[in-house]
């Protein structure tokens, strides 16, 4: 995959600063993509740990999750736009596999953006996991497993199928893609998600 330049990456990551509304606050995904749940409406957040807009969006989505409807299933998927994003994607799937997302997900965001720590390579991520109580050998085993490789490659493919051009982005039931750049604010983004959920119930 061709590496994205710094200036283009900045444009791709641009979220809250875009205030001009599109005609619709979401885009249709054609063809519709499968979801992991047959019985619930899936809401999927696509993110990158290195993205400041994703970090800013976290408290908004966490607050929204407090009142998650019973017929809605929320998932996260790391986005991958170039090779430098792969390590963070593998870190997410590793934490998920080890059952330590509660110890890793938000703290890693904080370490990168609030504490300004450099945690991008496998070794840096390993040290971070160890600091959160994860065995280093277990981390390395899972991080470099074929299962995690398959998962991050699948995430890359799905990002293309969703036609995502920046993060954070939210996919509703495999049919709609929305983001703060389309809605104008994080508050409007959550409102749009709610509206799309209602739309899917009909």
Can you say where each PLM-predicted feature lies in the sequence?
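Extracytoplasmic thiol/disulfide redox context detector
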Residues: 3-86, 156, 160-161, 195-202
